[in-house]
């Protein structure tokens, strides 16, 4: 490599160009790759993937039984040359060769040997994990039982006792039957038959009102005796009553009552125990004062 001495510490353009040419020729001449078109990197170039798998110990044996050439020939339908098997070579375990015909022993282009399928035992005889108790419990389903005596011989109670470990526990149905809570008779009482509705009464004609004759009473007594007939009007008569000029004090007047289905308001629980002729009102409303 040449050494260039610079006088004054100044490098001219010609000197710099010669230095670059010398560097390219002597250093990068052999290792410089040829220019090529830029291509985007592939997925395998971006990620460092380890595609080398561990060797399979059975790969060589399988390749000898089913070589790639034989598989390709079978797919393409190409006839192969049959040669007698080597002495001591085992036959495939899952295929059996039929006895060769005399005319097939000669060398030449012949068809593939006829293979007969055999039944293969695919059952796994390896000892696995023993079945756990959880699998047996999941397989058993809960069954609601109804027995004559609650808590005795009930499958529902036995299911809960086995799962919880409590020998005195009972299922919900036996508990309610024992305590008498919210248990009704198995057969409901027959509902009363609805009474036939009475036929609507026919409208009756109102009697005609006879206009009353206002007469001035002769005496304060309402009853009068007739002197000509010597009879006294003690009973009811067909004539309307007489109107007196004197009005009695504090007469009893009828009060209109509105018929309703509401019950009387309840202030405390004791009101429910008191016998009352009217039905009780269990609503939240209170009567106005």
From Swiss-Prot:
Its main location: host cell. GO terms for biological process: DNA-templated viral transcription; regulation of DNA-templated transcription; symbiont-mediated activation of host apoptosis; symbiont-mediated perturbation of host cell cycle G1/S transition checkpoint; symbiont-mediated perturbation of host ubiquitin-like protein modification; symbiont-mediated suppression of host cGAS-STING signal transduction; symbiont-mediated suppression of host gene expression; symbiont-mediated suppression of host JAK-STAT cascade via inhibition of STAT1 activity. The modification Phosphoserine is found at residues 89, 219, 231. A motif (LXCXE motif, interaction with host RB1 and TMEM173/STING) lies at residues 122-126. One of its GO terms (cellular component) is host cell nucleus. Residues 76-140 are annotated as: Interaction with UBE2I. It is found in: Host nucleus. Residues 82-107, 187-245 are annotated as: Disordered. A motif (Bipartite nuclear localization signal) lies at residues 258-289. Keywords: Activator, Early protein, Eukaryotic host gene expression shutoff by virus, Eukaryotic host transcription shutoff by virus, G1/S host cell cycle checkpoint dysregulation by virus, Host gene expression shutoff by virus, Host nucleus, Host-virus interaction, Inhibition of eukaryotic host transcription initiation by virus, Inhibition of host innate immune response by virus, Inhibition of host interferon signaling pathway by virus, Inhibition of host STAT1 by virus, Interferon antiviral system evasion, Metal-binding, Modulation of host cell cycle by virus, Modulation of host E3 ubiquitin ligases by virus, Modulation of host ubiquitin pathway by virus, Oncogene, Phosphoprotein, Transcription, Transcription regulation, Viral immunoevasion, Zinc, Zinc-finger. Transmembrane segments: none annotated. One of its GO terms (molecular function) is metal ion binding. A zinc finger (unnamed) spans 154-174. The keyword Glycoprotein does not apply. A motif (PXLXP motif, interaction with host ZMYND11) lies at residues 113-117. A motif (PXDLS motif, CTBP-binding) lies at residues 279-283. Residues 219-237 have a biased composition (Polar residues). Belongs to the adenoviridae E1A protein family. Plays a role in viral genome replication by driving entry of quiescent cells into the cell cycle. Stimulation of progression from G1 to S phase allows the virus to efficiently use the cellular DNA replicating machinery to achieve viral genome replication. E1A protein has both transforming and trans-activating activities. Induces the disassembly of the E2F1 transcription factor from RB1 by direct competition for the same binding site on RB1, with subsequent transcriptional activation of E2F1-regulated S-phase genes and of the E2 region of the adenoviral genome. Interacts with host UBE2I; this interaction interferes with polySUMOylation. Interacts with host RB1; this interaction induces the aberrant dissociation of RB1-E2F1 complex thereby disrupting the activity of RB1 and activating E2F1-regulated genes. Interacts with host ATF7; the interaction enhances ATF7-mediated viral transactivation activity which requires the zinc binding domains of both proteins. This is Early E1A protein. It comes from Human adenovirus C serotype 2.
